[in-house]
């Protein structure tokens, strides 16, 4: 699982988790 923001870059804040 990777954390992305709304632009698809890897961040931890204000984003979402790729649960794959």
From Swiss-Prot:
Keywords: Cell outer membrane, Disulfide bond, Ion transport, Membrane, Porin, Transmembrane, Transmembrane beta strand, Transport
Subunit comment: Disulfide bond interactions within and between MOMP molecules and other components form high molecular-weight oligomers.
Species in which this protein is naturally found: Avibacterium paragallinarum (Haemophilus gallinarum)
Family in the record: Belongs to the Gram-negative porin family.
Gene Ontology molecular functions: porin activity
Gene, per the UniProt record: ompH
Physiological role: Structural rigidity of the outer membrane of elementary bodies and porin forming, permitting diffusion of solutes through the intracellular reticulate body membrane.
Localization (cell): Cell outer membrane
GO process annotations (BP): monoatomic ion transport
The name this protein goes by in its record: Major outer membrane protein
Any one Gene Ontology cellular component term annotated for this protein: cell outer membrane
UniProt membrane topology term: Multi-pass membrane protein
């Amino acid at each position: 699982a990777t954390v992305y923001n709304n632009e698809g870059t890897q961040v931890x804040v204000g984003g979402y988790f790729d649960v794959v």
